[in-house]
């Protein structure tokens, strides 16, 4: 057993009294502190309601209470959860599955702070190299400069020059005047020494180099004092750089800063922000540190070059109308001598570039307000895309999204995707620059840092000692949570929910906080069985340093390794919300609950008696090479249940979500997203559509609910319109909608609730006093079908609705599928925002199932078992098998062995993640996979079969 950390006088348990959030049935529950506690139970049984909406919400609210009332009103309310009392609570940190930020500047390196420590390492211990000659840069003290000049130019006449302008245009009248007033007599302009005279100026449009001639002297030991004074003056004038020219007009540079003595380029002293792509001091100026640039995609803007601009040849603009943008194009046509009626294919490419991207010339645009009032506007034309952007920005985000269709993302030509200035990329530690390190996967990076001391100088080792300790610790934690295949430059928005969550977990372990209650939501998502033990060890590590760890989890290993388990149930939704068993895993096994039945083998997901062979047709993807895929060829037998497996990072999502799905989506629905590179695809003619079912919420507003999402609400409204009472009153379907005026309660605008703003207290939702929470006005509610009003129907659970609507096939079919996927407990009008990820996914599944079946559909599900209990998985597999039995193809990306063992065909990728993956190790039946030596999946599947 691990050592317990309990302070004297401290409560040893977290106690929750009277929890009633969502479906919790006024429960009292307690669990030990400083232990690993798992909450398990069916999807919808109240696990998240207890862990996140009660315990975490209360901890968060207490933290908010510490702020002043004035600050709280700006923070948005933290509602007090519906619970009588929570005691023994430490500060809470929740690590959820919500994918991290959509910010393109957020990367694995910045989230874990490894990149920040690497910036510090490069700023303090990096060596600079010239980007011109590749030689190591030097810096000298004033004494070293003096001694070098004495030695190198002994008994030779030299000019001591202070460079003040390097490679820039301008007439520099003021500069020459300023130098003259300081008492200098000569300057060197573009290599030629000239006398300074009043009103002197250079050619304004040429690029110039200007140096002040500080002194001309014969170098000799006797003149050392004069030489020293001149050097110091020149260094001051030119901010630390001086130039020497000898008799032969050869030039030599010296600097107090980092400098290349051959080419004369110098770098500023490196600071940590020199290596930050989020700082103007480090970011590449072309792409502002993003590594990519948007380019106008000419083919999308001009899809049909046979049309003229008047006929709508420019897709974003459409046909000619009397609007400002066309007035500008008229003026442009006049200036460049072309016609808006000419087909675009007959206009030169040079002019097309000007139309799209603009030019430096000033345009005169005449605008006629009426026949006698014409005004001329002078504008700089920046191209139609830029103009549209400005207009769209005023119209909000959706309009900006339309514009994305006309632009494509390309790697920045300046930094080639490295995000940094060339100066920053020429600082090296042990022959690697910071971008080269950011491109290594975590496993390679760990190896590189292990041997680093032997490759550094003594001075570098002293400086780097503490930094290396921090970097190694953080890399170690990433390895512990199974993320060895990620690279530091991977952007946060490309991470899956499970990866993002485990990165946050590694960051938390890295912070080494103690006396905290961590609450995690299924950290094993997207994690292969192989890495499970490491994850459990990482959670135990958090516990052993003195924290409480509360995990919502369905994974068998995690449940059995916990110190304490809370099993919620007995069923889901209104039938759940109670603690059916709790205690150590050993105590739990003695109880009789759905969970324990699956744990001790009383119940199990059966292996099918025989595998389906499919319909004999195959979809073949050839030579897929996106991300880490190594030119793989994948066979998808149609009419089967296909499982795509492999360790995390082996290339499953690249193969399916980024290659196969975009290809099919483009083929059937002309979708814009480009697939990753591949050779060819055969067999598309055997499929008639593709459907992807993921776990994103089905609606983000309280007005969205299962009946509106599945479309059954329209049928129900049409039914109510057919009723005699509705016909007499002349009601249309809109009368029964709570989203439009007419039949809804106008006081609450059909929400049934009023939100009362409480300034610095959380907003309070109260039932609307007009309709009493029923959403509709009195007249609408008077129309009844079999004694029920439209509001009563929305309050029915799916189970009740199935019985109620049995006589009406159109409605019955849609509601029955919701019951078939195991959602009998939710109500028709339940707000989508209250559904869990697993529930939302099943609403989508039911929606697809209720559609007329063509029997040739290709379904793609990415980890459908997320958030599902063993019993839920059984129900889900029943649904998927039904789809396949109708002739459809169902493809699941999955780690769950219960799903893999019932698949007809398995495609296993690997053998490792990242660069070590990307091969297809095996394609065939689960039985044959077991004997594949290189496959980690096969090893674990053996036990399941």
Description of each model-found segment:
Residues 1-945:
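Conserved phosphate-binding elements of NTP-dependent enzyme cores
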């Amino acid at each position: 057993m691990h050592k317990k950390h309990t302070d004297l006088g401290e409560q040893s348990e977290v106690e929750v009294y009277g929890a009633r959030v969502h479906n919790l049935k006024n429960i009292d529950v307690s669990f030990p502190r400083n232990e690993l506690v798992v909450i398990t139970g069916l999807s919808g049984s109240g696990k998240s309601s207890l862990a996140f909406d009660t315990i975490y919400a209360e901890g968060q609210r207490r933290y908010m209470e510490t702020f002043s009332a004035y600050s709280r009103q700006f923070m948005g309310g933290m509602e007090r959860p519906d619970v009588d009392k929570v005691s023994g609570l430490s500060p809470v940190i929740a690590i959820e599955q919500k994918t991290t930020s959509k910010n393109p500047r957020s990367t694995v390196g910045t989230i874990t702070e490894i990149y920040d420590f690497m910036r510090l390492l490069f700023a303090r211990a990096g060596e600079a190299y010239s980007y011109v000659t590749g030689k190591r840069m030097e810096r000298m003290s004033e004494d070293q400069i003096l001694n070098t000049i004495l030695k190198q130019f002994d008994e030779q006449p030299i000019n001591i020059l202070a460079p003040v302008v390097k490679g820039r245009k301008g007439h520099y009248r003021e500069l020459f005047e300023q130098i003259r007033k300081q008492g200098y007599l000569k300057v060197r302009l573009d290599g030629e020494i000239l006398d300074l005279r009043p009103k002197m100026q250079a050619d304004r449009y040429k690029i110039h180099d200007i140096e002040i001639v500080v002194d001309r002297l014969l170098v000799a030991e006797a003149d050392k004092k004069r030489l020293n004074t001149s050097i110091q003056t020149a260094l001051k004038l030119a901010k630390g750089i001086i130039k020497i020219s000898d008799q032969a007009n050869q030039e030599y540079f010296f600097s107090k800063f980092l400098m290349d003595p051959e080419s004369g380029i110098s770098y500023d002293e490196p600071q940590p922000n020199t290596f930050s792509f989020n700082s103007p001091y480090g970011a590449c100026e072309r792409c502002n540190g993003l590594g990519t640039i948007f380019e106008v995609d000419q083919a999308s803007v001009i899809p049909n070059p046979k049309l003229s601009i008047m006929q709508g040849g420019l897709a974003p603009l459409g046909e000619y109308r009397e609007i400002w943008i066309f007035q500008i194009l008229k003026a442009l046509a006049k200036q460049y001598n072309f016609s808006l009626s000419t087909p675009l294919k007959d206009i030169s490419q040079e002019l097309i570039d000007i139309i799209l991207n603009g030019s430096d010339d000033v345009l005169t645009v005449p605008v006629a307000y009426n026949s006698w009032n014409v005004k001329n506007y002078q504008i700089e034309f920046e191209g139609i895309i830029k103009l549209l952007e400005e207009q769209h920005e005023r119209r909000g985000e959706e309009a900006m999204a339309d514009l994305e269709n006309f632009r494509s993302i390309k790697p920045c030509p300046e930094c080639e995707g490295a995000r940094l200035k060339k100066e920053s990329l020429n600082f090296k530690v042990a022959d690697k620059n910071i971008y080269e390190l950011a491109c290594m996967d975590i496993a390679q990076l760990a190896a590189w840092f292990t041997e680093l001391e032997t490759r550094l100088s003594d001075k570098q080792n002293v400086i780097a000692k503490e930094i290396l300790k921090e970097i190694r610790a953080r890399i170690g934690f990433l390895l512990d949570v199974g993320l060895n295949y990620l690279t530091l430059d991977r952007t946060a928005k490309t991470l899956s929910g499970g990866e993002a969550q485990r990165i946050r977990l590694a960051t938390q372990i890295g912070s080494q906080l103690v006396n905290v209650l961590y609450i995690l939501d299924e950290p094993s998502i997207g994690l292969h069985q192989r890495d499970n033990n490491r994850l459990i060890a990482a959670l135990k590590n958090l516990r052993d340093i003195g924290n409480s760890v509360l995990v919502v989890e369905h994974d068998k290993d995690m449940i059995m390794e916990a110190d304490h388990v809370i099993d919620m149930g007995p069923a889901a939704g209104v039938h759940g919300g109670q603690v059916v068993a709790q205690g150590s895993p050993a105590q739990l096994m003695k109880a009789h609950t759905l969970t324990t039945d699956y744990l001790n083998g009383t119940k199990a997901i059966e292996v099918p008696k025989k595998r389906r062979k499919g319909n004999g047709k195959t979809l073949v993807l050839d030579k897929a090479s996106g991300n880490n895929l190594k030119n793989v060829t994948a066979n998808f037998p149609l009419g089967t249940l296909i499982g795509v497996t492999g360790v995390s990072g082996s290339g499953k999502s690249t193969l399916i979500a980024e290659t196969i799905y975009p290809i099919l989506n483009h083929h059937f629905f002309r979708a814009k997203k480009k697939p990753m590179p591949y050779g060819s695809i055969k067999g598309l003619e055997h499929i008639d559509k593709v459907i992807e079912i993921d776990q994103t919420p089905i609606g983000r507003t309280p007005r969205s609910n299962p009946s509106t999402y599945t479309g059954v609400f329209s049928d129900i409204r049409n039914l109510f319109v057919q009723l005699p009472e509705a016909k007499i009153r002349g009601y249309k379907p809109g009368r029964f909608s709570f989203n439009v005026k007419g039949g809804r309660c106008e006081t609450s605008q059909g929400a049934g609730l009023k939100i009362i703003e409480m300034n610095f207290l959380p907003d309070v939702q109260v039932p609307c006093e007009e309709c009493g929470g029923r959403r509709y006005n009195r007249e609408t509610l008077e129309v009844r079908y079999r004694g029920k009003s439209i509001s009563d129907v929305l309050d029915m659970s799916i189970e009740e609705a199935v019985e109620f609507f049995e006589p009406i096939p159109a409605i019955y079919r849609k509601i029955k599928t919701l019951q078939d996927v195991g959602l009998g407990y939710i109500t028709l009008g339940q707000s989508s925002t209250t559904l869990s990820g697993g529930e939302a996914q099943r609403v989508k599944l039911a929606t697809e199932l209720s559609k007329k079946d063509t029997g040739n559909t290709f379904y793609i599900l990415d980890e459908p078992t997320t958030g599902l209990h063993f019993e839920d998985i059984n129900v889900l597999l029943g649904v998927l098998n039904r789809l396949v039995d109708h002739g459809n193809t169902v493809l699941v990306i999955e780690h769950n062995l219960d799903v893999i063992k019932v698949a007809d065909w398995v495609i296993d990728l690997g053998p490792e993640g990242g660069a070590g993956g990307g091969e297809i190790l095996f394609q065939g039946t689960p039985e044959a996979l077991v004997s594949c030596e290189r496959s980690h999946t096969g090893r674990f599947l053996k036990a399941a079969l």
